[in-house]
């Protein structure tokens, strides 16, 4: 547990614990802040750009980030992942659109799925000839590094080219256990990139960001965007 309960400004806690300041928000900031719905032809699929799609494979995460752009759906009551029927329809949509070459698995956190369901999704996508790249967006290696098991890395290796975007926010998250999980993924030939959200009171100073970026590079994770 990285959270210091005695520190009201703990940078890890501020990512996940509610703050009264969140109540000061406009409706458009909470309903669909990045406009996914207008680009969603099917349940669980966002087709915003011609050659790539976002495939939402689950509603669940190991933690619930206060800044999540899909907070309206993440953690909602229902099945752990979208219904298999909906997922099959979304994959059929991808198969029927040859212009799509890049599929990003998101949600929720795809690595919160069990190995069997995750591999079923990867196998279905890899069987589509025009899908060149599969990406997985996840915070699981950061908050639950024990999820990155030898069995999981063996599964992921079967579906190259496969990339992972990991969600890092503060240098305190780069524990030895997290670095080991990243090493397992990197050793499996998976390019690792970091997505970082700029958060007031968490990482909005040069020193913290420098520490984070240097720690990421040392863990074989390329800082991708801030």
Show where each model-derived region lies.
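Short, structured patches in soluble enzyme cores that scaffold and shape functional sites
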Residues: 59, 69-72, 107, 138, ...
């Amino acid at each position: 547990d990285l959270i210091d309960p005695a520190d009201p400004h703990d940078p890890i806690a501020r990512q996940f614990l509610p703050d009264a300041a969140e109540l000061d928000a406009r409706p458009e900031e909470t309903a669909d802040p990045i406009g996914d719905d207008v680009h969603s032809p099917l349940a669980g699929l966002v087709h915003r750009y011609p050659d790539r799609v976002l495939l939402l494979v689950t509603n669940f995460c190991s933690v619930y980030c206060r800044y999540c752009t899909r907070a309206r759906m993440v953690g909602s009551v229902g099945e752990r992942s979208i219904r298999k029927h909906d997922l099959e329809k979304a994959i059929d949509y991808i198969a029927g659109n040859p212009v799509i070459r890049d599929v990003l698995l998101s949600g929720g956190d795809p690595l919160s799925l069990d190995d069997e369901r995750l591999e079923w999704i990867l196998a279905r996508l890899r069987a589509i000839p025009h899908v060149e790249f599969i990406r997985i967006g996840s915070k699981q290696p950061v908050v639950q590094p024990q999820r990155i098991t030898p069995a999981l890395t063996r599964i992921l290796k079967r579906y190259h080219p496969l990339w992972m975007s990991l969600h890092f926010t503060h240098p305190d998250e780069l524990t030895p256990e997290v670095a080991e999980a990243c090493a397992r993924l990197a050793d499996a030939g998976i390019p690792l990139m970091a997505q970082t959200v700029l958060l007031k009171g968490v990482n909005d100073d040069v020193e913290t960001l420098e520490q984070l970026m240097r720690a990421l590079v040392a863990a074989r994770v390329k800082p991708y965007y801030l």
